[in-house]
Amino acid sequence: MNPNYLDFEQPIADLEAKIQELRTASAGPSVNVDTEVRALENKLRLRTAQIFRNLSAWQISQLARHPRRPYTLDYISVVCDEFQELAGDRTLADDKAIVGGLARIGHRPVMLIGHQKGRDNKERLMRNFGMPKPEGYRKALRLMKLAERFGLPLLTFIDTMGAWPGIDAEERNQSEAIATNLIEMAELKIPVICTVIGEGGSGGALAIGIGDRTLMLEYSTYSVITPEGCASILWKDAAKASDAAEQLNLTARRLKEFGLIDKVIREPIGGAHRNPQQMANRLKAVLLNELEALDKVPLVTLLNQRHKRLRTYGAYENH
């Protein structure tokens, strides 16, 4: 099976292969298979729509991790008319799992920060599989405070399995770096829009996920733990990940129903990786609309609403 297809997409892969075979066969001048190709293309559209209308939480989790899914830098190349990356936390290093910088979207100057994964093994290692270390979150915080200083709206793109759990990260106080970002983002005196574009994993996602609007792409996920991690803890069996995915309620639709996010951004049929350009243009339009709406909210009201929405997530009681 083509590695760009997931298991549940096998019927789609088969139809696309048949269409390609017919097109190859019709390369000669005496062969005309246009009618057959059109019939198969229509069948393909209907079958794809049917499959993607009935996706399970586990299947959506797989789509959120698809190796061809657009990452932060892919969206930046389309959404932003200009982008100047800024590097380093000014303390230790430049964590490549977090990218960020000054950007312009249309006429709007913004600060943009996001997780970044890799396409091949070399880049995955360089990006640490999109799992930031403390210096990544401290770089993000530096850019957030820079945005606040210059009155720039902050946009974040979330796509990580979670924060890096290695000993080196713990030695540099990973939990403190995440906690500091949560505190600081809650008080930023600028509009903040957070968008989950792939995986939203635990505190590693939340460390750039506190804002005035939380958006999710249709086939993204947001959860305290991966389905495999949850299954390993609850049932001592990672093979039960599909059951865990259902119990975690990690899909955009479910989180919207719970009132934990503000908007679900529809993806092209088949997922964002099937038409990255269309997905990026759709995301750009939504972000510009949300920025325009937040422009009309006074700063005091903005902060009060941000604090109120954080309190609706739940409360901790010490008995």
Curated annotation (Swiss-Prot):
Pathway: Lipid metabolism; malonyl-CoA biosynthesis; malonyl-CoA from acetyl-CoA: step 1/1. Belongs to the AccA family. This is Acetyl-coenzyme A carboxylase carboxyl transferase subunit alpha. One of its GO terms (biological process) is malonyl-CoA biosynthetic process. Its main location: cytoplasm. It catalyses: N(6)-carboxybiotinyl-L-lysyl-[protein] + acetyl-CoA = N(6)-biotinyl-L-lysyl-[protein] + malonyl-CoA. One of its GO terms (cellular component) is acetyl-CoA carboxylase complex. Disulfide bonds: none annotated.
